[in-house]
Each structure stands twice: as C-alpha cells, then as structure tokens.
Amino acid sequence: MWRLLATLSCLLVLTSARSSLYFPPLSDELVNFVNKQNTTWKAGHNFYNVDLSYVKKLCGAILGGPKLPQRDAFAADVVLPESFDAREQWPNCPTIKEIRDQGSCGSCWAFGAVEAISDRICIHSNGRVNVEVSAEDMLTCCGGECGDGCNGGFPSGAWNFWTKKGLVSGGLYNSHVGCRPYSIPPCEHHVNGSRPPCTGEGDTPKCSKTCEPGYSPSYKEDKHFGCSSYSVANNEKEIMAEIYKNGPVEGAFSVYSDFLLYKSGVYQHVSGEIMGGHAIRILGWGVENGTPYWLVGNSWNTDWGDNGFFKILRGQDHCGIESEIVAGMPCTHQY
C-alpha cells in the first residue's frame, strides 16, 4: 500500500513539474522538451532573430468578442467523410492553396476572413470568379466594428463588414494584383534572408478608397459583397458540415509559445506561456496516426510550419479552436 502511495506521489510530482517547467519562447530548450514528450507533433525553429514583441503582435485576434447570429444546424443531414481537404475538393480555386503573410501587424483577424471569403467566392461561383480579396481593404477601412487594426480585431466584425460595405480585390505585398494589394512587407524570420527584420512595431495603414494606379475598374465598382455572415456552433460535426458544404471558415484560438515551433504532425499544447489569440482559416480535417485533426492555413508565410499550414487536435475544442468559428455566403448574383 505504501509503495503504491509512494509511486502515486512520484507521478503527481512529475506531472506537476512538467506543467510548471518554464522554457523561454523560441528556445532550443522548448524545442527539445516538446520533442522528448513523444507527442503527436514535432517542434523546430520557425523564427530566428525576431523580437518576442513581434511574435505576440502576430496574435491579433481578440477572443470572446461580439458574436454573429448562429446559423441553423444541418450536420445531421450530411454524410461526412473521414477526411476532407478543400484544396482537393475545389482544385480550380487557387486561393485555397495560397498562404499569405500578415507582416509586422496583428491583422490575422482580417487575413483569416479574406482568405476564406476569397475561397468561397470561387466555390460558389463554380470557379468562374477567382479573386484575391484585399486584406488591406479589410484591415484599414473596417474601423471600430472590427477592433483596432494592427493592434488586434474581431473575426465577427470582419465578416459583418463584408456584408455591409463589401471588399475590393488585392493580392500579396508588392504583387500589384487587384485594387488594393497588401502594403505591409513580409519580414525576415530567418538569419540570412533578404526581407526586413521582424519587429513588434507597425502602425495600421490608412484607409484609401482608391485603387492603385493603372488598375480598373474603380474602387467602388471592384467591391465584392457578402449576402450573409454567421457563427457556427461549437460542435465538431457542424463545423465539418459547414466546410464540406460551403468551403473554408475562419476560426480563432489561444496561442501558446510551443505552437510557434510547430513543424509537422497534429498540434496539441504541451508547454509554454500564452501569447494571445490568433485567427486562421480552417480548410479540412482528417485523422493522423489515430489522432483527429483540423487542417488549417496560417498567415505567417510558407516558411512557417508545414509550408504555412498546420494540423491541430479536432473534437475537443483544443485551445478554443472550435468556439470562435465564423463564415458567410457571397452574393453570387453580382457575377
């Protein structure tokens, strides 16, 4: 009996020690600790020579903000496959495969929205309309309803803005694609790269209601509108059904410092301090080595994670990933 109690006491001490261990964010020690746990994912370095203030600024989703009306449940009427990847389901929609870069700005709330909106315009126009919806237009012109620009915002406000005011086209930084391409440059995560260094500084650009020189139609004529915006219940099957029927959605979750080190596998939080809320685009699901996951596109460039994508534990609202799902439907009659 005493031997059993001693063993249990040791286990409790070890468990407590594991949860209370501190490793500096982005450190070799945290990478090694995660990998020694033999969990469902592998850690490695994605950021080099960056300020922690920059990394925290990337996490610009304000969690628990205003809620959109919840759409009616319909998952019971849908036969859902074990795995689903929107990139394969709609191969003629190139934006689904695209990974963007939010730069030194807490604009993830805008990126998750415009990425999923771009995908849905293509999907619901049966591939006739391929447009990169402008993150710049969303970030700079939405105003207080969306939060505070580069200092963080609400995914729900972003989708509501799309239905009320519409969004113009706009590609990546320096792409000269669309009416209002992104104006904040990608920054350098690596040691010997050519991009400017990543800092935590960065003001929200001004709202400009004109397209870049040489682009037509006009700003007003280039607007793409949503006909509805809504939240999806914190329910695994309802989220799956929404993606399966209508396309990628925007979600948000709590980021811990171990997530910054994600390289492959199915992420689940192991150790590290909280960094903030982060908005992303969920485009599918599956099962890897017995672990169910969501397939997610990030906005930290293709040199982060698994070519810019990651997988995260599905079905347990892990880090709140299932509690902030928002989406909407484009006005396809305008096409």
Swiss-Prot record:
Places the protein is found: Lysosome; Melanosome; Secreted, Extracellular space; Apical cell membrane
InterPro entries: Papain-like_cys_pep_sf, Pept_asp_AS, Pept_cys_AS, Pept_his_AS, Peptidase_C1A, Peptidase_C1A_C, Propeptide_C1A
Pfam families recorded: Peptidase_C1, Propeptide_C1
Catalytic activity: Hydrolysis of proteins with broad specificity for peptide bonds. Preferentially cleaves -Arg-Arg-|-Xaa bonds in small molecule substrates (thus differing from cathepsin L). In addition to being an endopeptidase, shows peptidyl-dipeptidase activity, liberating C-terminal dipeptides
Keyword Ion transport found: no
EC number annotated for this UniProt entry: 3.4.22.1
UniProt keyword terms in alphabetical order: Acetylation, Cell membrane, Disulfide bond, Glycoprotein, Hydrolase, Lysosome, Membrane, Protease, Secreted, Signal, Thiol protease, Zymogen
Chain positions listed as propeptide in the UniProt record: 18-79, 333-335
CDD domains registered for this protein in UniProt: Peptidase_C1A_CathepsinB (cd02620)
Similarity remark: Belongs to the peptidase C1 family.
Self-association state and partner proteins as the record states: Dimer of a heavy chain and a light chain cross-linked by a disulfide bond. Interacts with SRPX2. Directly interacts with SHKBP1.
Protein name: Cathepsin B
Organism: Bos taurus (Bovine)
